[in-house]
Design a protein with these regions (language model features):
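Glycine-rich adenosine-cofactor-binding loop
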Residues: 2-17
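NAD(P)-binding Rossmann-fold cofactor-contacting core
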Residues: 21-39
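Rossmann-fold NAD(P) dinucleotide-binding segment
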Residues: 45-86
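Rossmann-fold NAD(P)-binding glycine/threonine-rich loop
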Residues: 70-75, 88-127
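Conserved anion/nucleotide-ligand pocket segment
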Residues: 127-192
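Substrate-binding/catalytic subdomain of NAD(P)-dependent oxidoreductase enzymes
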Residues: 163-266, 285
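ATP-dependent carboxylate/acyl-activation modules
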Residues: 256-323
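A conserved regulatory-domain signal marking ACT and ACT-like small-molecule sensing domains
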Residues: 297-379
C-alpha cells in the first residue's frame, strides 16, 4: 500500500512511526507545513503532490477541522483513492456526501479512529450490525469530560479548578468548548448511530447539553443519593426514527459507567440477539489514535470495505420518544418546572419522567434566564 499522509502533527507523527514498523505500508509522501528533516524527500508542502500521484492508492487524513480536509478527502475519493481518516468533524458533518462519493467511485472510506481514539469501537459495531439488529449505541465517548467529572466526584473539587488541571495535562484544549458543551461527543454519536442504524443523521438535529455549569455542590448531592454524574451520549432505535441526545446523566454507583476513571471511554451497543457489548479504553492520544488509523490501512489491505452501505437513509431524530426523571438546579423560578417536580434535594429538584427533547429544549431556554442552570438525566 502506497500512502499519502495529510498531516504530521501528534496523530500524523504516530501514524508515520507505526507505519515504519510494517513492511506492507509505504508512506510515500507526507504533507507538512514546514520542513521536517527526518522525513527527507518524503515531505511535501503542496497537497497536489499527493492527490495527483497515481502511485498513491490510499490517502490518510489526520489534519483535523472541516476545511480544507473535506475538499481534499472529496478529491481523493473522486480519484478512486481509498481514504482513512481520524477526523470526526468531517465525517459527522459530511457523512452523507462522503459515503455517497466513496460508493460512486468504488473507493473505501474508513474512520475507526474518529470515535474512541484507540478503542476498536466502530469496527466491532460494524461486526455486530452484520449479524444482529442494533437497538442502541452510546456511553462515555469523551475523555476530557470524563476526567473532569471523575476528578470532581473523587476529589470534591470545583469545575474551574479541574478544567484548568485538564488543560495543564493536555486533556483539554485552550478553548474547551467543544468538549464541555457536548459538541465533540455529539459528533461521535452521529457517526456511531449512522453506522449502527444505516442512517443519515445530522449532528445539528441531535440535542446536547454539556457540563459547563456543574458544581461541586451538585456532585456532593449526587454522591449523597448514591449516584455519580457522567456526560453520556445515547441513540436508540424507535419505530419511526432514532432517539438521539447528549446530556449529563446520574448513574448509580454500581453501574459500569460509574466506575470509568480519568480520561477513559466506555462505549456500548445493544443488539436484539447479542444483548449489550461494551468497549473500554483510552479515547485519545498519539499512539492509541494512530494505531486505529494503521489498523484501518491493514484492513484495506485485507479487503475490508468502508463504513457505508447502499441502504443508508435519512431518519428522524426523535429525542421526545424517550422519557426519564431529571435533576434540575436553577435560581430562576419556572411554572413548568414546578409542575413536573416530584422531589427536592439539597441543591436541586427531581422531576418525574419528562421527554428528553422537551427537557433539553427547556434547559437551553432556561440558560438564557439563568446562565448557571444545570440539568442531568437520571438513569
Amino acid at each position: 500500500m502506497n500512502i499519502g499522509l495529510l498531516g504530521f502533527g501528534v496523530v500524523g507523527g504516530g501514524v508515520w512511526e507505526l507505519a515504519q514498523e510494517n513492511r506492507a505500508l509505504n508512506v510515500k509522501k507526507v504533507l507538512v507545513r514546514r520542513e521536517v528533516p527526518p522525513l527527507g524527500e518524503t515531505a511535501v508542502q503542496d497537497v497536489e503532490a499527493i492527490l495527483r500521484d497515481p502511485d498513491i492508492d490510499t490517502v490518510v487524513e489526520v489534519l483535523g477541522g472541516l476545511h480544507p480536509a473535506y475538499e481534499w478527502i472529496c478529491r481523493a475519493l473522486a480519484a478512486g483513492k481509498d481514504v482513512v481518516t481520524a477526523n470526526k468533524a468531517v465525517i459527522s458533518a459530511y457523512y452523507r456526501e462522503l459515503t455517497a462519493l466513496a460508493h460512486e467511485n468504488g473507493a473505501a472510506l474508513r474512520c475507526t479512529a474518529a470515535v474512541g481514539g484507540g478503542i476498536p469501537w466502530l469496527v466491532n459495531l460494524q461486526r455486530c450490525r452484520r449479524v444482529d439488529t442494533v437497538t442502541e449505541v452510546g456511553g462515555i465517548m469523551n475523555g476530557t469530560t470524563n476526567f473532569i467529572m471523575d476528578a470532581m466526584a473523587r476529589q470534591g473539587a470545583d469545575f474551574p479548578a479541574v478544567l484548568q488541571r485538564a488543560q495543564e495535562l493536555g486533556y483539554a484544549e485552550a478553548d474547551p468548548s467543544a468538549d464541555i458543551d457536548g459538541d465533540d461527543i455529539r459528533r461521535k454519536l452521529t457517526i456511531s448511530a449512522n453506522i449502527a442504524f444505516d442512517a443519515l443523521l445530522r449532528e445539528e438535529d441531535i440535542p446536547a447539553f454539556g457540563i459547563r455549569t456543574v458544581t461541586g455542590a451538585d456532585m456532593k448531592d449526587f454522591r449523597a443519593h448514591g449516584f455519580t454524574c457522567k456526560l453520556l451520549a445515547c441513540a436508540q432505535r424507535t419505530e419511526t426514527g432514532v432517539a438521539a441526545y447528549v446530556e449529563p446523566a446520574l448513574v448509580a454507583e454500581g453501574e459500569p459507567e460509574a466506575a470509568v476513571p480519568g480520561n477513559y471511554n466506555l462505549i456500548s451497543c445493544t443488539g436484539e440477539l447479542l444483548g449489550r457489548q461494551s468497549y473500554f479504553g483510552q479515547g485519545a492520544g498519539r499512539y492509541p489514535t494512530a494505531a486505529n488509523v494503521v489498523q484501518d490501512c491493514l484492513d484495506l489491505l485485507a479487503g475490508e470495505d468502508g463504513f457505508y452501505t447502499e441502504t443508508a437513509r435519512p431518519m428522524a431524530v426523535e429525542a421526545d420518544a424517550v422519557a426519564h426523571p431529571y435533576y434540575v438546579r436553577t435560581r430562576t423560578a419556572d411554572p413548568w418546572l414546578e409542575s413536573v417536580t416530584a422531589d427536592r434535594w439539597d441543591s436541586g429538584v427531581i422531576t418525574g419522567a419528562v421527554p428528553v427533547g422537551q427537557m433539553l429544549r427547556w434547559a437551553a431556554a432556561q440558560r438564557q434566564r439563568d446562565p448557571g442552570c444545570f440539568v442531568a438525566g437520571i438513569r
